[in-house]
Amino acid sequence: MTKSSNQFIKNTILKLLGAIGSEKEINKYIEKFSSPEQRFAVIKVGGSVVENDLENLISSLVFLNQVGLKPIILHGAGPMLSEALEEKRIDFSFINGQRVTSLEVRDVAHEVFKETNQKIVEALETQGAYAKGLVSNIFQCAIDDPDLGYVGSIQSVNIDLVNEVLESDSIPVIAPMGFQSSEMLNINADIATVELVKAINPYKAIFLSETGGIFNKTGQLIPNINLTLEYEELMAEEWLHSGMKLKLQQIKALLDYLPRTASVSITEPINLPKELFTDSGSGTLIKHGYSVAQHKIPDQETQEHFKKIIETSFRGNLVDSFFDDPGSLNIFMTSCKRATIAISNDFSVPYMDKFGVIPEAKGEGLGAGIWHEMRKVYPQVFWRSRPNNPINNFYTSICEGCQKQDEWHIFWIGISDYGAIKACIEYAINKPKSVI
């Protein structure tokens, strides 16, 4: 390895470590991902990333290599293929996010995928990470939809070849090309990634894109998606279409196949280490998720689950009088019994008395899911939080107003009348503590 390569790696590690989290957090995830029984990660790299953000991609992958982790890379090359086809004046079109592939398009696709694959492999090896390109010998396919032309429907995945590359201490770099007998076939890269993950069953499945996540109609990043609660709602949105809609459909199909605890992340290359090695992550985290139930008059069992979640989350004791008037409370709780919200209705405006997620579930998106369901029911709500509460950044990002006091920060949504806001602030300041 050259001196310049060593310096590159040193600078890369320093830059990435400083950008993510604590050493304790990083070591926790490295230990988790280093299990010999399970592959570390399948990372799908969008073609636009290779074209426009190769340096950050290679930096992040070299970092993983340096800490002893070998991801399996599957890349696309959509923008480069479209450009090559336009240069050759070859017509092409899409059906539901998939490229219609004539014989001419297929042949150009093969050349573009080979070039893109080689570009990634050479960039990795230049910086000291061994890599091997796998262009058309991983996916055995059939043609299921004649309207799409030479597009493969994956029937099986050559896991043995992938494992051989990993065991030779190299990073597999896979192109989305398949074969039927001796016939090469084009494959949508997102679909190929889903089938690869099903076959490999890694700890993590990550999609790297230039945008770094899924954004809503106002251009805001969606940090968490709970498919159980939000999938149908999202699929009905006009702003979700074409490639991103297909991607979400494929991710749902993947998570339906995997254990309920599995997740898929969409992020950008520079934030890949943060997504892997911190609880907060970066980009959009998609999980199968859990349903959320309302308990308008919480029974004894619900009260016990609520007490356990809150006391674990707040590291204190719920006051004995909390459920003295259970009819004034509306308890939201996830079906996994790891996140809860209590809304008190004993004031003129609904008051969020408690919002808790157990520490072990931090970073799983449970809080976002239960918050989403609570807001469907309560367009008006206010609450308070200690000034040092780490969730205050989230509260600040979603509230419509905030009053900061020495002991409490008071937040509200959906309240515009000044007198009502003033009354809510007074109520929140003077309300006795419910966890001691």
Enumerate the predicted regions with their spans.
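C-terminal catalytic "cap/lid" subdomain
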Residues: 2-381, 389-390, 400, 410-436
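Conserved acetyl-CoA-binding loop of GNAT-fold acetyltransferases
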Residues: 398-405
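Conserved active-site tyrosine of GNAT-family acetyltransferases
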Residues: 395
